[in-house]
């Protein structure tokens, strides 16, 4: 019994590390997607998810060390500190025709919703693989967001 408790502790610690390794951001790379519930210092750590899932609200555009700047663009950012300090430069993970709630919030994570949902506050009316906000001219978009890595421009119609 004396040896059982240390073994259980080691198993629990190793299990927790493995869960964080495979679902946390410590090894997250550009092109992978995350669920971010809130953009604040007190929010839960993002979770890696399949980019095709409904919960995948952001995609990692770039990962930079420490306090380095993100590439040119309108990235949301999450900074992680500790043994490994890094910043994730995040793009909205949505396609043309998708609707979102939380887009107009300063801290809420985006949530993909039905375009008929009363919580909807934004709709992506055009998405291109270029970095040119001028592509949004002539659309219903009130906001244009562009990212240099990967090259993307989002034309967003906001409801409020």
Regions found by a protein language model. Name each.
Residues 2-5, 15-160:
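Primary mode marks residue(s) on the alpha4-beta5-alpha5 output face of response regulator receiver
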Residues 8-11:
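Glycine-rich ThDP/TPP pyrophosphate-binding loop and its adjacent helix/strand module
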